[in-house]
Amino acid sequence: MFTLKKSLLLLFFLGTISLSLCEQERDADGDEGEVEEVKRGFLDIIKDTGKEFAVKILNNLKCKLAGGCPP
C-alpha cells in the first residue's frame, strides 16, 4: 500500500511539473502567436485581392474571345 501511495504521489508531482512547464511555454508562445495572426491576415488580404484580379482578367478574356462584351 505504501509503494502505491509513493508512486501515485510521484505521478502527481511529475504531472504538476509538466503542466507548469506547458503553461510557461504557452505564455511564451502567446506573444509570438499574435504576430503570426497579423501576418496571416495580411497574406489573406493579398491572396483575396489577387483572386479578384485574376477573375476580372479571365472574365475580360472570355468576353473578348466570345465577342459579346457589354459596355
Curated annotation (Swiss-Prot):
InterPro entries: Antimicrobial_frog_2 (IPR012521), Frog_antimicrobial_propeptide (IPR004275). Keywords: Amphibian defense peptide, Antibiotic, Antimicrobial, Cleavage on pair of basic residues, Disulfide bond, Immunity, Innate immunity, Membrane, Secreted, Signal, Target cell membrane, Target membrane. Residues 1-22 form the signal peptide. It is found in: Secreted; Target cell membrane. GO terms for biological process: defense response to bacterium; innate immune response. Expressed by the skin glands. Residues 23-40 form a propeptide. It holds the Pfam family Antimicrobial_2. The keyword Signal applies. Disulfide bonds join C63-C69. GO terms for cellular component: extracellular region; membrane; other organism cell membrane. Belongs to the frog skin active peptide (FSAP) family. Brevinin subfamily. Antibacterial peptide with amphipathic alpha-helical structure that exhibits potent broad-spectrum activity against Gram-positive and -negative bacteria. It is active against Listeria ATCC 54004 (MIC=30 ug/ml), S.aureus ATCC 25923 (MIC=7.8 ug/ml), S.suis 2 CVCC 606 (MIC=31.25 ug/ml), B.subtilis ADB403 (30 ug/ml), K.pneumoniae ATCC 700603 (MIC=60 ug/ml) and P.aeruginosa ATCC 227853 (MIC=30 ug/ml). Does not show activity against Salmonella ATCC 20020 and the fungus Candida albicans. Is also cytotoxic to HeLa cells at high concentrations. This is Palustrin-Ca. It comes from Aquarana catesbeiana (American bullfrog).
